[in-house]
Amino acid sequence: MHIHKLKAKIKKKHQEKYLTKKKIQKKLFLNESEFRRLCIFKGIYPKDYKDIPLKFRNKFYKNKVYYTRNDYKKLSNEKIIQDFRKIKTSLKRYKKYKITLEDNERCKNIIKNFPKYKLDHIIKERFPILVYAVEQLNDALTAIIAYSFLPSNENIGIKNNLINQSIILRNHVKGYYLQAEILQKKITWLIPHIFTPYFDKSIDFKIITNFIEYYVTLLRFILYKLYRLDGMSYPPKEYKDLKNEKLNHLSFDKNYITKELSNELETKESTEDNIIEENEKKTKNGKTENCEKNDQENEKKTKNDKTKNCEKNDQKNDQKNDQKNDQKNDQKNEMKQIEHDIIXNDNTKSVKNLFKNHIFYIHSNMPFDVLSIIILSCGGTICWNSLYSPYKYDDKSITHEILEVSEENKNTQDSNKINNINEYTYKRSFIQPQYIFDCLNSNMILSCEDYNINKTLPVHLSPFIDDDNYKDLVKKDEYTINKMLSEDPQYNKSIQKNKTNSENKXNNYNDNENDMSEDEYNNAIRQKLRNDALNNQMEAENENNYNPQNDLKQENDLLNVQKINNQENIKRNKLALSKKKRKLYNKIEQAENRQKLTIEKFIKKSKNKKKQK
């Protein structure tokens, strides 16, 4: 074969590797929405124009969307395409019988037998091992939790069924940990605050629903596997009484239900069992009376046969009652393991027993869901304002109370309770919600003095920093920033004014206690202590650890910080410019860099000539 013919064949092969979106849709007989949904489920994404080799880019257009031939093969062999076609035909039939023929009975039959598709086989293909599926939980959990807060609006594309499913899965996940370790892999996700949703027309919510439809099946698959590893059944049973309560996740877990609440639920179940047993006894007595009458009338042979049948029925009923009693005893033994321990152990530092023997009362204005799950997962107990709470507000066994006092809370229902704080000052400690998060991050119980009501809270540090090198860098940056601020004359003038004001306030505090608040006094003292600490640190470095190299390092650090700040400001200003002005600015920068390079070369040549002489 001639060389030119070989080259022509090679070009055709490269051209056939990439197919446009419209060609694939025509071959598969799919709409854009169906094709998009199928690509999301299969994890297939289009190719960039830059990925195509340079030799064959001339015959491709930048604005079009291209897929590879291997992607087309994966999509063509998919079973869901047939389900999409069945859904189309069923919708056409429904419109025909509803609008033209007005036959409601057939419409009901179509709705009952409406086709559905499943994504189980796709997840097994994409994730043959459970560890690969766990790696993608970061995006799945954040999307499901955010979608559960949205209201249903099918005109935009937000379906009510998926919202309910995402809420149920959110309650199945035990412990709303922002970071969890599953199968030796760390997973992080976000729990957003309660917000009022704003529907933007630029956002296509139908695409989001397609992603969440995939994430819901993935999360169910992982939960099923994890429950089976622990020897548990999925989906777990739920208590009907706790469905409409704030703590929906308690209705799925027997281990987290407290002693008093479990007794109430057992009494309801026992009453139902007693009613069933009474009905069974009545049926027994009726059967025995009928047997005696028939025995007197019939012969001796028939008597023996009937008495045997009656005895067998009695034995079966006795066995059923024995099985029910055994199940009740097993449930009671399980609940005894969950009893509240009175003795406090200060040495327990593990996360599971961190809040052991602590009882927290949570007010209605607090972030109830997150706090409740953290406390329960760490071995604590919870109280709240409802009939199903295990402890009431007036109970003396409560150790901590979580609330935040503000001007808004004074008009709420909790105002009466907040005004009566003096009654419980010696028995319980009043805490802000940051206390629980800081205790969990440090894996130890902290003192409650810094987290009392109407006090400025300490800095909330991120718990995800594991590298010691990163911690050292943060400390250096803080020191350099404080040093830069101390060197600025404007900042020093403001500090001096604050010093004089704080000293005058400290001297005249005893005279003007009613005029000055506690927060202002504490802020003034903190500013004074901070400035004193900086001065002492600078003096100690100059006296004991004086090295000229350290001074050079500090100066270099300051220069680097200034350069970084200047670069960030330049980038921000670039974004505000138009395209033409950006191009001009880039050309100016390139010209300046060229001039600098030429000057540096000229200086080097001159230095080398002097050395040679």
UniProtKB/Swiss-Prot annotation:
Q: Which domain of life is it from?
A: Eukaryota
Report the main location listed first in the record. nucleus
Q: Which UniProt keywords apply?
A: Coiled coil, Nucleus, Ribosome biogenesis, rRNA processing
What compartments host this protein? Nucleus, Nucleolus; Nucleus, Nucleoplasm
Which residue ranges does the record assign to the BRCT domain? 350-453
UniProt xrefs under InterPro entries: BRCT_dom, BRCT_dom_sf, PES
Xref: PROSITE patterns: BRCT
Q: Where is the composition biased (Low complexity)?
A: 497-511
User: What GO annotations for molecular function exist for this entry?
Assistant: ribonucleoprotein complex binding; RNA binding
Question: Basic and acidic residues bias: where?
Answer: 278-333
Q: Where is this region: Disordered?
A: 268-333, 485-517
Please provide, in alphabetical order, the Gene Ontology terms of the cellular component aspect for this entry. Answer: nucleoplasm; PeBoW complex; preribosome, large subunit precursor
Which positions carry the signal peptide feature in this UniProt record? none
Identify the Gene3D superfamilies for this entry.
Answer: BRCT domain
Q: Name one GO biological process term.
A: maturation of 5.8S rRNA from tricistronic rRNA transcript (SSU-rRNA, 5.8S rRNA, LSU-rRNA)
Q: Which residues form a coiled coil?
A: 259-344, 492-601
The text of the family note is: Belongs to the pescadillo family.
Q: What does this protein do?
A: Required for maturation of ribosomal RNAs and formation of the large ribosomal subunit.
Which PANTHER family does this UniProt record tie to the protein? PESCADILLO - RELATED, PESCADILLO HOMOLOG
This protein is called what? Answer: Pescadillo homolog
